[in-house]
Amino acid sequence: MDMKVVPWRLKEDFLYLMSCFYNEGQEGIPDLAALFRGVEIIQAWSTRGRIPHSVESTSQLVSSLISNDRSQKLALAVSISRFVSGLLDPIQQSQYAIPMAVLAKSIDLPTYFVELRHAITHEELPSLPVLRQAAQRALSWLYDHYWNPAATAESEDTYDYTETNELHKFEIKRKVKDLLKQWRSWRKVNVSANMFLPVEEHDYIQQFEALVQELVTTANLRLPYIPASFVDDEKDLDFAIETTNLDIVVSCFLEKRVLIPSRTMPISFFPKLKNVWLPLLQSIASKHSFFLPALFTTLWSEILEISQTVDSLVFLDLKEKEELTDKESAGCYLAKWYAYLMREAYTGQPWTSTLSVTQTDLASVLEICLQRSDPFTKIIIDELSILDKELENKFSPLFQYRSDMFDSRILDEQEFEDITLEQMKTELNKFSVRLNNIEAQADSSTMEFQGHVWYKPSVEPSPIGQIIES
């Protein structure tokens, strides 16, 4: 059996590339971003070795079709000519030259392409509409005679690259856990030691720097197998997470005995936990530009996932609850770490320079938290609502309402029976007064136009041309 070396490692890579150029069943045209992505992947693969002619031709034809510059006509002519020559020249093996039309019939290539190639080479270039139509017909021919047969052929590749990655991740995770265990054991004994002194002053500083460098180096190492969908995005966070050990290192930090206590602990223990791990986080963040953004993003995903497991109809005040479950305790500490990192980044602390948090980001987080009723997002609101005065004023009625809901309790049937009609009226009057206050405040500071509420700025009248100090 003939074996050929190809630039993709797995059939899934080939299928992903095919999906960039062709929709399933060739129905419609893929979006422009997918076409560009396919061209980029082939360009990256070309650095690995020879690209099959049909794959390279597809890339050239697509590039010519999506080009908008003045040279599109010439680009289409060249790509069509190469498409025909690349198919027919390799089978021209006779001692005497065989007409191209005959060779074309042997591979079921319409003679239309041969005639068009002859016109491009020896006559005046055909018009742009003719070339565009020819390029599209060439792509259809390539789908029928190369891409679809290759995609549906039985794969003889028995090597499981996914399993290789999983074994690699297991080994890396064990290594990272050992390094974090070393740090935890030493830091608990030397909890007050300054870890940012010059390296030459203390031996423990040298050991600390060596441990940090080992973690950073490990995080930067590539996975054994990188999917085709992650080619040529070197400066992208998603690329770093999907193709290196960064995701493994970050996940190790979010386990028990690291950023989460080994057993259920009250939230008041957080300052002590922070004192243990903050120097290590700060040092890694200064040496790995993606570490802090990856940790921040993963924390948020974990918090949202845990919050979905809490019954939205039950409001828990964790400060008064006698015993927390493991999941509740973990969720609280993840929320505390997330709020701490966001506060540090929002206030511009130097060690968080790789993590950008704008007012829009802060507002988005607060809005999402306000839509949830779990105790973890309440922690985030309590920590972050005071960071920005403008946002605090904007959301204050919602903050107050949510706080009141958390202070309330779900009553059983017996407790409902004990409530008198007068008590219910008093409670209703209280809410009415609050609603009137909110409406009065809205009337004085907002106006409605075409269904939208606009906040009116409080600006004193002044003569035209006079500078108003804000």
UniProtKB/Swiss-Prot annotation:
Membrane spanning stretches: none
A cellular component annotation (GO) from this entry: heterochromatin
Disulfide bonds: none
One Gene Ontology biological process: cleavage in ITS2 between 5.8S rRNA and LSU-rRNA of tricistronic rRNA transcript (SSU-rRNA, 5.8S rRNA, LSU-rRNA)
Cellular localisation: Nucleus; Chromosome; Cytoplasm, Cytoskeleton, Spindle pole
Keywords: Chromosome, Cytoplasm, Cytoskeleton, Nucleus, rRNA processing, Transcription, Transcription regulation
GO molecular function: endonuclease activity
UniProt keyword Membrane, yes or no: no
Protein's UniProt keywords contain Nucleus: yes
Family statement drawn from the similarity comment of this UniProt entry: Belongs to the LAS1 family.
Task of the protein: Required for both pre-rRNA processing and heterochromatic gene silencing.
Subunit structure: Interacts with crb3, gcr3 and eix1.
Name listed for the protein in its UniProt record: Pre-rRNA-processing protein las1
Gene name of this polypeptide: las1
